[in-house]
């Protein structure tokens, strides 16, 4: 069943209250995890600190696979923030959804193309910013005409394509997962006991698969961000 989004108008702009709520909740969860993992740092990490150090090592590996550490080390915090934020955002809509008066309030924020495309624009914008900052404006602009000048239009198209695919890939995977979970839940509620029994196992299987997909998508989003960053800031690209 399709549910409306809770929208409000303010100063001629339309705001999706569900997106705003879920973005805030995602940010709070990531912040709480970060604080819990760094409150009492120890030489021998345990618990949350051990988990956070594993995340840092994992993202460090992503960066090292795309650019040299001297160049990419400054993006470690960005990568850790991205992978944690996208992962948490992908997971929020899996256990349940909340509908009030036909409006969908609780969902994964990344199941909305507006959110994922905004994230994509932000990270691609950052790659351009650091490209200019680290290479200088003239050298950065010359990259669009290398190795030959007639590639310039294609490279402009590539920038738009990278932004669209980065955002829409994440949206499509998460949105499709939540739609199927909603259909299975409807089967369980509309067809009595038999429907509930018949939907239970597929729901559990699909939720497990959605956790896997959400994790992979967080990795892909972070990896592609670092790939795009390497293309802009590394002198050998």
Swiss-Prot record:
It comes from the Bacteria. GO terms for cellular component: plasma membrane; proton-transporting ATP synthase complex. The chain crosses the membrane at residues 17-37, 75-95, 112-132, 179-201, 214-234. PROSITE patterns: ATPASE_A. InterPro entries: ATP_syn_F0_a_bact/chloroplast (IPR045082), ATP_synth_F0_asu (IPR000568), ATP_synth_F0_asu_AS (IPR023011), F0_ATP_A_sf (IPR035908). SUPFAM superfamilies: F1F0 ATP synthase subunit A. Keywords: ATP synthesis, Cell membrane, CF(0), Hydrogen ion transport, Ion transport, Membrane, Transmembrane, Transmembrane helix, Transport. The keyword Ion transport applies. Pfam families: ATP-synt_A. One of its GO terms (biological process) is proton motive force-driven plasma membrane ATP synthesis. It is found in: Cell membrane. GO terms for molecular function: proton-transporting ATP synthase activity, rotational mechanism. It is a multi-pass membrane protein. F-type ATPases have 2 components, CF(1) - the catalytic core - and CF(0) - the membrane proton channel. CF(1) has five subunits: alpha(3), beta(3), gamma(1), delta(1), epsilon(1). CF(0) has three main subunits: a(1), b(2) and c(9-12). The alpha and beta chains form an alternating ring which encloses part of the gamma chain. CF(1) is attached to CF(0) by a central stalk formed by the gamma and epsilon chains, while a peripheral stalk is formed by the delta and b chains. Belongs to the ATPase A chain family. Key component of the proton channel; it plays a direct role in the translocation of protons across the membrane. This is ATP synthase subunit a. It comes from Geobacillus kaustophilus (strain HTA426). The gene is atpB.
